[in-house]
UniProtKB/Swiss-Prot annotation:
Component of an E3 ubiquitin ligase complex composed of hiw and Fsn. It is found in: Synapse. Required in the presynaptic motoneuron to down-regulate the levels of wnd and restrain synaptic terminal growth at the neuromuscular junction (NMJ). InterPro entries: B30.2/SPRY, B30.2/SPRY_sf, ConA-like_dom_sf, F-box-like_dom_sf, F-box_dom, FBXO45-Fsn/SPSB_families, SPRY_dom, SPRY_FBXO45. Pathway: Protein modification; protein ubiquitination. The gene is Fsn. Its main location: other. GO terms for biological process: negative regulation of gene expression; negative regulation of synaptic assembly at neuromuscular junction; neuromuscular synaptic transmission; positive regulation of protein catabolic process; proteasome-mediated ubiquitin-dependent protein catabolic process; protein ubiquitination; synapse assembly involved in innervation. This is F-box/SPRY domain-containing protein 1. Residues 1-48 form the F-box domain. Residues 58-250 form the B30.2/SPRY domain. PROSITE patterns: B302_SPRY, FBOX. One of its GO terms (cellular component) is cell cortex. Gene3D superfamilies: 1.20.1280.50, 2.60.120.920.
Amino acid sequence: MVDPLCNYNVLEAIFSYLELNDLYRCSQVCKSWYHFLNDENSDVWRWHCLRKLPKESVKSDLLASVSTYKTKLRAYLHAWSPNDCSRNVYIKPNGFTLHRNPVAQSTDAARGKIGFRQGRHAWEVIWEGPLGTVAVIGISTKEAALQCHGYVALLGSDDQSWGWNLVENHLLHNGDMQGNYPLLNNAPKYQVGERIRVILDCDDNTLSFEKNYEFLGVAFRGLPDKKLYPTVSAVYGNTEVSMVYLGTPLDG
């Protein structure tokens, strides 16, 4: 008779050396393997997390909203893309925070590594430096520009991007101001360091926001059936913006 502990240790050793795509396939093999991999704080996920993430990020307060090794790893895989941002932006060693270099008369943007066309997705955006005259968060397709001359609301300036300008509390799309947001009398302005939760519903084709766990309402409806990416655009030199992917939003 095989010792269950021995079987567990063998699986742990094997799964720790597989690629992440292979782990998903393994979870579909049988109930036993599914339950084994469903433990998001197991040594398997710990090993993969520590192997992929920078050490400084694993226990960082930035990842306070993703408490397990598996969700931390998932957040890292969805973070800002160093290959899909303005030349005036770089991604810091923690993997989650972008830094805009102090380049005059330029507006610069960055997209996440992974876009979405199906399902419901949520991520947090934390502006960790000054906003400047324009600071926009939202989504875009791959066709949206990531850099332009001047200090403008780049995100939302064309038909391939949708954004919320945190400085003026305006919604922007196709170069037009779509209205005030949120729809509150004397809506408070964003304070540096606050976490804003972005909620993209690809089933209902809507984009919404939350701040301080308060739902602010649907910002955009009728989004196209295209792959949409988390995006921000910034103008202030040396400002920094972090993004943490959370997964499927919890209702209520």
